[in-house]
């Protein structure tokens, strides 16, 4: 039986109200990697817009903060480490998107963790067929976690 994911939770956001608990982050990440039968270590860093903006500009060339950035750990094949990678989640963007999309805040936090973990596992949504596969898997995982389909909400 899987023990779960080991989470290194770093909260550097000034406002730390309404954040999920460490146990919730672990539950959501574990659900996302369960299909791969992994028990990895993942760093989840909760940041403010300035750090998200800087990282998004540096690594993606996008001049704005974003909800979640995924940085897969690239380990040489001969080295076996359980590190999967890092997720950087922007508190303000997640809160704003949840409100704009009419989603419960915990559901959107869970979705961002699941979405980011799938990126760490190599899933992407650049091409249409990739997006369909990834979104289908996200919906399945979110449903297993007791949340609604994250793509069923309309923007307000």
UniProtKB/Swiss-Prot annotation:
Gene Ontology cellular component list: cytoplasm
Alphabetized UniProt keyword annotations: Cytoplasm, Endonuclease, Hydrolase, Metal-binding, Nuclease, Ribosome biogenesis, rRNA processing, Zinc
Cofactor: Zn(2+)
Pfam families: YbeY
Classification via SUPFAM superfamilies: Metalloproteases ('zincins'), catalytic domain
Binding site for Zn(2+): 115, 119, 125
Localization, UniProt: Cytoplasm
Enzyme Commission number: 3.1.-.-
GO terms for MF: metalloendopeptidase activity; RNA endonuclease activity; zinc ion binding
UniProt cross-references to InterPro entries, sorted A to Z: MetalPrtase_cat_dom_sf_prd, YbeY, YbeY_CS
Record note on cofactor: Binds 1 zinc ion.
UniProt cross-references to Gene3D superfamilies, sorted A to Z: Metalloproteases ('zincins'), catalytic domain
BP terms from Gene Ontology: rRNA processing
Protein family according to the UniProt entry: Belongs to the endoribonuclease YbeY family.
HAMAP family: Endoribonucl_YbeY
Function: Single strand-specific metallo-endoribonuclease involved in late-stage 70S ribosome quality control and in maturation of the 3' terminus of the 16S rRNA.
Name the record gives this protein: Endoribonuclease YbeY
